[in-house]
Amino acid sequence: MTLLLFNILTVYTFTTIKNLQSDLLAGKTTCAQLVEESIKAIESKKHLNAFLEVFSDSAIAQAKLVDEKIKSKTAGKLAGVIIGLKDNICYKGHKVSCSSKILEGFESLYSSTVVERLLAQDAIIIGRLNCDEFAMGSSNENSAFGKVLNPLNEKTVPGGSSGGSAVAVAANLCHVTLGSDTGGSIRQPASFTGTVGLKPTYGRISRWGLIAYASSFDQIGPITKTVEDSALLLEIMAGKDEYDTTASQKEVGDYTTSLNDKKTFKIAYLKECVESNGLDTEVKKHTLDSLDKLKQSGHTVEGVDFPYLDFLVPTYYVLTTAEASSNLSRFDGVHFGYRSPNATDLESTYKKSRSEGFGKEVKRRIMLGTFVLSAGYYDAYYSKAQKVRNKIRQKTREILSQYDFIVTPSTPGTAFEFGKNSEDPIKMYLEDIFTVQANIVGCPAISVPNGIHSNGLPIGLQIMGRDFEEGNLLNLANQI
């Protein structure tokens, strides 16, 4: 590890990217100083296990380049912004493992589109962040490299699968991070750590360079301290991409400019969500209080029926495991990644490498996905789940044709203690009951902080919007 050779007189306090840019131009801090502070913060809070690796050398080199650009007034919109990457996003010349033994030591051969776009605006990539293995989990207990601790209460989980990304922001280890969201993997950890987590519309941000879990659900997004920073990052990362045919051709909005426009909206909340037996009473109260405040601010707020709540989680897990069983078939011990030393022939190489390389939860989902795609059960499970997905899409879009937004709690409760749900897969899966809807449908959704529970942990509020209307979504989120 390369260390800088100057002393920091005062540690810089990060608030927003906009303020950071002003302070860099005014000479109140430098990119080199910011990188050193970040490296020291990560080291001092190493026990949180948020970072799997710190890219010290490349970050320091980038900081020096950006400092020169600032002096010559040619720096980009993210000059000096220190960003952490979830360990399933590729950065050329750097390791990426999806927090799995099967990819341990694998080095990216190219950079993801999002990384290229961030670097083009002079961002500084500081390292890769721990997550649930192959983004499969809701607690960050499934990583092959150890669990991540919630800095707000180290006995509790940070959420998953982007737990390391949320913790890095909440614990001030870096300024902002990227995660991926397949069923709530950005929004749930954001809720558990008191940060802002944005899942854009499916296709708004290119998935090129994101190691796939479930291709029709996955979406990259930011975790930040403020809605303003999420808006700026989305503006920079969004847009068409020749390497990803699912990336939308739609024009990218000016999300930061429209953020503070005074707008009033028509908002729906799902009655079944706020009346759910599994919803914590304080989470319910905070949700209803926020809806009342929105009403008092001039917004129209009405409850609507959503009869498919109980079908969300089963539909999600049938379809995502099916896609995962296909996507993860490439990790076979032959092409790249872990190869079992105990294999004697090609067949045993496949079997032993996958059995030894994948963790318990990943193997569970691969087996479930293979089962629902098998000839005897395809119609009974996979085909039926696709039909239910269409029903959920139709109903959600019907609501969004009459209302601008759908508001729900982000999660049924606050961060839970380690081990509480890990032996009960169904109970763990139900942690995603409010977040999976946006991925099933493909619409954008954001989790914003919504007060503190009596147990001292943060509560999140989720807002879902119409496809590609992130400008309005961010505007409302900024009002809360």
What are these regions (language model features)?
Residues 27, 86, 226:
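Short, conserved phosphate/pyrophosphate- and ester-handling motifs at nucleotide-, phospho-/glycolipid
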Residues 27, 38, 80, 174, ...:
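Glycine-rich, small-residue loops and helix-cap segments
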Residues 38, 59, 86, 118, ...:
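Conserved hydrophobic/aromatic pocket- or pore-lining residues that grip, position, or stack substrates
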Residues 44, 171-177, 182-277, 288-297, ...:
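Structural helix-boundary/capping segments
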Residues 50, 78, 242-248, 298-307, ...:
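Flexible, glycine/charged-enriched surface loops at secondary-structure junctions
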Residues 66-82, 229, 259-268:
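Immediate post-signal peptide segment of exported/extracytoplasmic ligand-binding proteins
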